């Protein structure tokens, strides 16, 4: 892979890191489970093909207590009963937001299920989580970010 200019540096990177910190705080304050957030980050990263973020968030998910088996089958989440109703709603919402250019909107049924299963604060935090991971994915993919020796 051709080496490219690193995009995750400088003041804009610091601003993005600050945004990520605010998203993490909002998620915690809203009572969103850390494992659910990591599933969301992993699913968006799968769709976007971001190996750097997949590596990072798989390690963070396991550290948060996520079962590796669920990570192995995450791409096929609809085909298994391993995910809760709330996790399924979050994953469907993540896919809709990540692939928004396919529909030009979040489908009404996906939105309705998300707001049925999450409080308003949780829904807002979930939306910002999806926005943030999609931004990170694009930065890492565009700059050909290399994997560290060990997932961090």
Place the predicted regions along the sequence by residue:
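Hydrophobic alpha-helical segments
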Residues: 1-152
């Amino acid at each position: 892979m051709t080496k490219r200019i690193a995009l995750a540096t400088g003041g804009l990177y610091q601003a993005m890191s600050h945004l990520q910190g605010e998203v993490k705080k909002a998620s915690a304050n809203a009572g969103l489970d850390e494992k659910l957030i990591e599933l969301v980050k992993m699913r968006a990263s799968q769709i976007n093909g971001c190996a750097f973020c997949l590596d990072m968030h798989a390690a963070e998910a396991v550290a948060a207590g996520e079962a590796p088996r669920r990570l192995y089958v995450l791409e096929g989440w609809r085909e298994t009963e391993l995910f809760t109703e709330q996790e399924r709603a979050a994953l469907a919402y993540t896919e809709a937001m990540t692939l928004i250019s396919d529909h030009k909107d979040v489908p009404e049924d996906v939105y309705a299920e998300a707001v049925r299963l999450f409080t308003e604060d949780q829904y807002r935090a979930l939306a910002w989580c999806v926005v943030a991971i999609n931004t990170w994915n694009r930065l890492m993919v565009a700059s050909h970010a290399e994997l560290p020796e060990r997932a961090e």
